[in-house]
């Protein structure tokens, strides 16, 4: 039996299931207790009761599962996550499980790659295979009896994984440098600076051809655009012209000017133009005599008597 790197004073958990032979389990526990000594501890736990046992987090240095000779244990994702939880940071998990070498759809037995992925997803690192070997006749019989699985392409895979040296949610102080950084400017290459420098003398030098920006424009570019051409295609369509909200094409101003012209043209006009000022400015024959002054354009109704008198 491999010692799995167990030393004195360590806490070890041994996981077994109904396929584990009792005598083989007892022999394994005795050997582990001899390795851990009086300061260490070996705990034996049934895999079906592991989740209900409520072991404290980070309780064990080593977890062994399915290692008992003759055992054919299958490990679910929940079981693997619980094993990772009870491991101390830096602790190791060793497990053995029958794996399928053929491609079988919806198989309860994992392939080797899927088993490695399951350990990684449970939170373990440095996952690697340790040993592959054929199943013994007793193990093949155990798979059929306890797992109800029949296949001629099974192997026994021993695999290990390590818990990271930190707990989930733990914090660590960052070592930040508080030394004042030099604010010196980078050195400038004189040759490069001279290359990109254009002096006033160069500007007046006739040998230097400078492009006149106005020459880049043709007569068409200098024409003032027609406001109608700037209007949106759908602006003002329909029987009633109406400017859009936040109009920017000029239709709103155009409609406002048309409205002002209509108001001016609709205002009543008099011959002298002074009727609205009051009687002091009205003609002798003005029909508005005797009426108070009014604003220009204000609608004033005249009675029939006033019209006949006028």
From Swiss-Prot:
Keywords from the UniProt entry: 2Fe-2S, 4Fe-4S, Apoptosis, Cytoplasm, Iron, Iron-sulfur, Metal-binding, Mitochondrion, Nucleus, Phosphoprotein
Binding site for [2Fe-2S] cluster: 235, 244, 247, 249
Region (Linker): 173-222
Cofactor(s) this protein requires: [2Fe-2S] cluster; [4Fe-4S] cluster
Motif (Cx2C motif 1): 272-275
SUPFAM superfamilies hit by this protein: S-adenosyl-L-methionine-dependent methyltransferases
BP GO annotations: apoptotic process; hemopoiesis; iron-sulfur cluster assembly; negative regulation of apoptotic process
Segments of this protein annotated with the region Fe-S binding site A: 235-249
Stretches for region Fe-S binding site B: 272-286
Cellular compartment(s): Cytoplasm; Nucleus; Mitochondrion intermembrane space
Protein purpose: Component of the cytosolic iron-sulfur (Fe-S) protein assembly (CIA) machinery required for the maturation of extramitochondrial Fe-S proteins. Part of an electron transfer chain functioning in an early step of cytosolic Fe-S biogenesis, facilitating the de novo assembly of a [4Fe-4S] cluster on the scaffold complex NUBP1-NUBP2. Electrons are transferred to CIAPIN1 from NADPH via the FAD- and FMN-containing protein NDOR1.
Domain notes: The twin Cx2C motifs are involved in the recognition by the mitochondrial CHCHD4/MIA40-GFER/ERV1 disulfide relay system. The formation of 2 disulfide bonds in the Cx2C motifs through dithiol/disulfide exchange reactions effectively traps the protein in the mitochondrial intermembrane space. The C-terminal domain binds 2 Fe-S clusters but is otherwise mostly in an intrinsically disordered conformation.
Protein name stated in the entry: Anamorsin
Protein source organism: Bos taurus (Bovine)
Gene: CIAPIN1
């Amino acid at each position: 039996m491999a010692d799995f790197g167990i030393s004195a004073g360590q806490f070890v958990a041994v996981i077994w299931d109904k396929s584990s032979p009792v005598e083989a389990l007892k022999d394994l526990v005795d050997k582990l207790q001899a390795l851990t000594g009086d300061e260490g501890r070996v705990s034996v736990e049934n895999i079906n009761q592991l989740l209900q046992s409520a072991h404290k987090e980070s309780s064990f240095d080593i977890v062994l599962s399915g290692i008992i000779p003759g055992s054919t244990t299958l490990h679910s994702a929940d079981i693997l996550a619980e094993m990772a939880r009870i491991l101390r940071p830096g602790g190791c998990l060793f497990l053995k499980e029958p794996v399928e070498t053929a491609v079988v759809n919806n198989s309860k037995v994992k392939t080797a790659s899927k088993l490695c992925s399951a350990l990684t997803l449970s939170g373990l690192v440095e996952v690697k295979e340790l040993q592959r070997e054929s199943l013994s006749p007793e193990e093949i019989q155990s798979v059929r009896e306890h797992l109800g699985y029949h296949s001629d392409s099974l192997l026994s895979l021993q695999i290990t994984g390590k818990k990271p040296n930190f707990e989930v949610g733990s914090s660590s102080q960052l070592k930040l440098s508080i030394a004042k950084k030099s604010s010196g400017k980078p050195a400038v290459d004189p040759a490069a600076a001279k290359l990109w420098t254009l002096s006033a003398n160069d500007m007046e030098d006739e040998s230097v051809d400078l492009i006149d920006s106005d020459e880049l424009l043709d007569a068409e570019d200098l024409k003032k655009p027609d406001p109608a051409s700037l209007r949106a295609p759908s602006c003002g369509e329909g029987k009633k012209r109406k400017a859009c909200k936040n109009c920017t094409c000029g239709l709103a101003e155009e409609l406002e000017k048309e409205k002002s012209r209509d108001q001016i043209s609709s205002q009543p006009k008099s011959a002298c133009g002074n009727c609205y000022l009051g009687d002091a400015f009205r003609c002798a024959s003005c029909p508005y005599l005797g009426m108070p002054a009014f604003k220009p354009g204000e609608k004033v109704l005249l009675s029939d008597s006033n019209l006949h008198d006028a």
